[in-house]
Amino acid sequence: MEDITNLAYWYPKVKHLVPTPKTEIVETDCNLIEILDGEAPNEWRGFIEDMRVAIGRLGGCPVFLRTGHTSNKHEWSDTCYLADVKDLGQHIYNLVEFSECVDMIGLPYKTWIVRELLPVKPVFYAFKGMPITQEFRYFVKDGEVDHRQPYWPPEAFLKSYSNAEKEWEKLLAEISVLDKVSDKELTAMTEKIGKALGGYWSVDWLLTDRGWYMTDMAEGAMSYKWQAEGFYLEKLPEGKELE
């Protein structure tokens, strides 16, 4: 059965439909679990060279690093944010370790992704330096949006490394309201993706200096969904609240 949650599955199908970060995909048969025991797999040097080449195609560091299934962005500076290529091996180690620990059977890590860092205007920082900016998650089923939400629920930051101190709640509230024009744009782009792929998907959108970019997707039934309330909602023109 095809692994449709793997970025390598869905990205080639949607990259020409909506704005997405420049992306390089590296597949490997390297037995990476061996690095957790302090050993270098036979294919290690070749894999690292392939990753370096991918980074070079994007103009070098800094880049966004992830597997086909996770970035573990809550450990930002130790995992997905690669500031210097000399730290590539350690970041790969950290992502492999995290992937092995997720749930009971872990996550696959044969697919590796290098992406450009999109220009954003953060309102505060959390999770070891991760820039927090406006993001929304849309759910699309059979080509129609049936739910949308701010990406970040407030409880995500209660135990974070935020340097915003007491201001973070106010700042989060400000970026958690979506204007009508943006909702119309994101709905249209999400439904374009949904019609192209079919099925039920969650689609994540990030506001950048270039506009809205689609950054991630996953099977809708397996994606985190929450109901935004109060100041997170803005009335649509016809008086219907955002779901």
Task: Report residues per predicted region.
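Active-site nucleotide/adenylate-binding loops and adjacent lid/helix of ATP-dependent enzymes
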Residues: 1-134, 139-142, 148-154, 161-188
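Short beta-strand
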Residues: 65, 204-205
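Short secondary-structure junction motifs
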Residues: 109, 200-202
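Conserved protein-kinase catalytic-loop segment immediately C-terminal to the catalytic Asp
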Residues: 139, 206-207
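Structural motif
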Residues: 144-145, 211
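Short, solvent-exposed aromatic-acidic interface loops
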Residues: 150-156, 219-222
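Short secondary-structure transition/capping segments
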Residues: 157-165, 238-243
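C-terminal active-site "lid" helix and adjoining low-complexity regulatory extension at the edge
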Residues: 177-184, 188, 192-200, 207-243
